[in-house]
Design a protein with these regions (language model features):
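Intrinsic disorder/low-complexity signature
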Residues: 4, 21-22, 35, 83
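Short, solvent-exposed recognition patches
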Residues: 63-125, 131-135
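Residue-level detector of functional hotspots within protein domains
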Residues: 9, 28, 32, 114-115
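Sec-dependent bacterial lipoprotein signal peptides
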Residues: 1-21
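N-terminal export/targeting and maturation segments
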Residues: 23-78
């Protein structure tokens, strides 16, 4: 009996499933969204949000309401945006006990993010980091 058609069918099925598997990986998902965005524009929007919403002597964290989300950041399809002194956390995916996304440093700022016990950062490009955070 010839098994070549069965191997071909399995190969085709495997290739068809690859994009779906990548969508479930939070890092791949975040990178895909970033590839379709203007990184410099995102950093400029974060700088504007920082000036507008984060006073120098105010809180360390400002959750940003959806009606205030800039157009460029909306294109990332975020779950939530939290503005910190070192940039904007753009949560893109959540799972039980974890949150994943991009941390964008404001244009003109040179913050170097360091991982902590709760949050792990990976630099993707100047001013943009991938993060995994325990909730």
């Amino acid at each position: 009996m010839n098994s070549t058609p069965m191997h071909l069918l399995r190969l085709l099925l495997f290739l068809a499933m690859l994009p779906l598997a990548a969508c479930n990986d939070p890092r791949s998902n975040s990178l895909s969204r970033l590839r379709h965005a203007d990184a410099a524009g995102l950093r400029a929007e974060v700088a504007q949000l920082t000036v507008k919403l984060l006073p120098p002597a105010g809180p360390e964290l400002v959750p940003i309401q959806p009606e205030l989300w800039p157009v460029g950041l909306l294109k990332l399809r975020p779950l939530r945006l939290n503005l910190y002194r070192d940039g904007l956390a753009v949560s893109l995916q959540a799972a039980p006990g974890f949150e994943y996304g991009l941390h964008i440093v404001a244009a003109g700022a040179d913050a170097q993010l360091k991982s902590t016990e709760r949050t792990r950062y990976e630099k993707l490009q100047d001013g943009i980091y991938y993060f995994t955070q325990k909730r």
